[in-house]
A protein has these predicted regions:
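Glycine-rich, proline-tolerant flexible connector loops at the mouths of alpha/beta enzymes
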Residues: 51, 70-108, 183-197
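Alpha-helix-loop-beta-strand connector modules within alpha/beta enzyme cores
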Residues: 109-128, 197-221
Length: 278
């Protein structure tokens, strides 16, 4: 029997989705299907980052196949595409050695912000599921841009630096105030090959928490072991990559699931695994 198509409204929050999954599953699922969808749907063609309407169509195809409870847009990937080869921006980011200057310059670039807002606006207004934006946590973003200051060592960056960075991020997020956003996830997971560094808890980012509260966005943070939501007892568990590859993997306990579907997964295997999620 075909299930009802999910719809979203400005009243929907990620916390609501976790409490009552619109897909009808017993536990809500948040999928990062970018690599898988690029492999299965685009089949080697480039991801249409430069055409928001084409990207929304590509994304909707993947959503229709996988039926997650939200539409997750990773802005770090979008930033990566839009800033690639932008030497003028990089020069500006390297103009001062002060900690956080590079990140502040990145988030203050008018041309970049215009392109990002146009893209997110099309995405948010065409998505058929509640929209959740994912960005690097302020500490992760600070680490990722710190080399522009002339210092490659990020070990001295601390929670105070991260809190200062969160002010730049919260100011930047105001551009999305008028969009139907259900949640904001700060990706604080350690990048492959990187050292963990100091852990900064979600509570440190008061400016972002205040903004999210004002906009009625559910705020969460993805740490290496689990995901948690601000002011909510719900804990998110990660679906292991092996689950999608057909191995006998037991799912961890959690109030909601987050999963990145690998590009090597077969469509038949993925569909079979989706059945086990309800």
């Amino acid at each position: 029997m075909e299930k009802d198509v999910m719809t979203t409204s400005t009243a929907t929050t990620l916390a609501n989705v976790v409490a009552s999954p619109p897909s009808g599953r017993p536990i809500a699922v948040v999928f990062d299907h970018h690599e898988y969808a690029a492999s299965v749907i685009l089949r080697g063609r480039p991801v249409p980052w430069d055409n928001a309407t084409a990207y929304a169509s590509f994304f909707a195809q993947a959503q229709g196949l996988l039926r997650p409870d939200v539409a997750l847009l990773d802005l770090d990937r979008l930033f990566g595409h839009l800033t690639a080869g932008n030497t003028s921006l990089e020069t500006g980011m390297a103009a001062r050695s002060r900690t956080g200057f590079a990140l502040r310059t990145l988030l203050g670039d008018e041309d970049l912000n215009r392109a990002v807002l146009e893209f997110v606006t099309v995405f948010a207004k065409t998505a058929r599921q509640p929209v959740v934006l994912r960005i690097p946590s302020p500490m992760k973003w600070l680490r990722g841009t710190h080399h522009f200051s002339g210092a490659d060592d990020t070990s001295a960056l601390d929670a105070d630096n991260a809190e200062n960075a969160s002010m730049y991020v919260s100011d930047w997020l105001r551009a999305f105030a008028g969009l139907p956003v259900a949640g904001l996830l700060l990706d604080n997971r350690t990048s492959a090959g990187a050292s963990p560094g100091v852990h900064v808890p979600l509570e440190t980012y008061t400016p972002i928490a205040n903004l999210a509260g004002n906009y009625r966005w559910t705020l969460g943070q993805l740490d290496d072991d689990q995901a948690r939501l601000h002011g909510d007892a719900a804990v998110g568990a990660y679906i292991p990559a092996g689950f999608w590859l057909g191995s006998d993997v037991e799912l961890p306990a959690g109030d909601f699931y987050l999963g990145e579907i690998p590009s090597a997964a077969s469509p038949e295997g993925v569909l079979a695994r989706l059945e086990t999620l309800g």
